[in-house]
Amino acid sequence: MEKTFALITIFLAFAFSGKCSDVFSRCDFPEGFVFGSSTSAYQWEGAVAEDGRKPSVWDRFCHSHNNQGNGDITCDGYHKYKEDVKLMVDTNLDAFRFSISWSRLIPNRRGPVNQKGLQFYKNLIQELVNHGIEPYVTLHHFDHPQYLEDEYEGWLNHMIVEDFTAYADVCFREFGNHVKFWTTINEGNIFSIGGYNDGDSPPGRCSIPGQNCLLGNSSTEPYIVGHNLLLAHASVSRLYKQNYKDKQGGSIGFSILTIGFSPSTSSKDDAIATQRANDFFNGWMLGPLIYGDYPDTMKRIVGSRMPVFSEEESEQVKGSSDYIGINHYLAASITNSKLKPSISGNPDFYSDMNVILSFFANFSSSEYDVAPWAIEAVL
């Protein structure tokens, strides 16, 4: 298996000047440590109906939830990317991590590439490179095209593996000479949970009482989507390594969101529950990527609702990442739940995990305190 290493995305509340006179400066970090900023297409670009772009699931989700904002304009990066790159230079950043809007680049499933969308990303990447900013590119950041959701339910259908691979092929071919770091999927675990268990992010599917989802099945869909994400990643990784890696010299990986879990007491039950939380939240994606299969704990608890890798699929997923991207914000203590995991009724991801999470510091759906110290336990 190819060596896998962690690429850690760290969010800083202040900028470093590049000098070593400050109490805390770049000089406190090893040579080669990369300081950068990060965003995604829907959070940054705006221009949602310009130059041939078609809606993504984020557009439909935001405009069908009246109490939500939307990304119609947002930072207006589509028009102001040169100003933003100048800010990066002024802030002394080394890198910019952004995502490509699939529905801007390919507005129809197997139709032609949108030349205006293509030119935007070429211009952005060239602007970054011209100013010494390394582009880190994500292919999917929660925003597959709405036309795929309408046609075959998007990530719930294995058909998306082929379409995602075709989309990635365009990106590698058109941008790969200047892009050395590719992430196929951003936070695969969170996309699966938020979009298909909780219903609080696109495409907004769930079956949890009180969540007001129109469609969905929280007992099965998160696991199906997670499975297809991994298969799509493996397919795209294989394409890159076979056709592009030697010529372009880049790396390709997959990212997850991690939480620093620790037991709330010294009891054996809480220690076991903490391991179970790690297996469900982190091992769900990491297990297949590193070992070729899901954690035994998940397979035992989820049972027949858990998709199964064929021997060939297992070998394709195992070792398919040159790196694992870690997005880290939070820490939580874990208490074993006295409730038995649901085997009937309406099980979901959290009832399967069957723990009580208590987040450290302030936490709400809209804001929370970052816990950088917990990343040591994650690693």
From Swiss-Prot:
Reactions the enzyme catalyzes: Hydrolysis of terminal, non-reducing beta-D-glucosyl residues with release of beta-D-glucose
Paired cysteines (S-S): 206-213
The keyword Secreted belongs to this UniProt entry's keyword annotation: no
Keywords carried by this UniProt record: Disulfide bond, Glycoprotein, Glycosidase, Hydrolase, Signal
Keyword Disulfide bond in annotation: yes
Region forming the signal peptide: 1-20
GO biological process terms, semicolon-separated: carbohydrate metabolic process
Catalytic activity, EC: 3.2.1.21
GO molecular function: beta-glucosidase activity
Record: active site: 187
Domain of life: Eukaryota
UniProt: a beta-D-glucoside binding residues: 43, 141, 186-187, 329
Pfam families named among the record's database cross-references: Glyco_hydro_1
Family, as annotated: Belongs to the glycosyl hydrolase 1 family.
Protein name per the record: Putative beta-glucosidase 6
Lineage per the UniProt record: Eukaryota, Viridiplantae, Streptophyta, Embryophyta, Tracheophyta
Gene transcribed to yield this protein: BGLU6
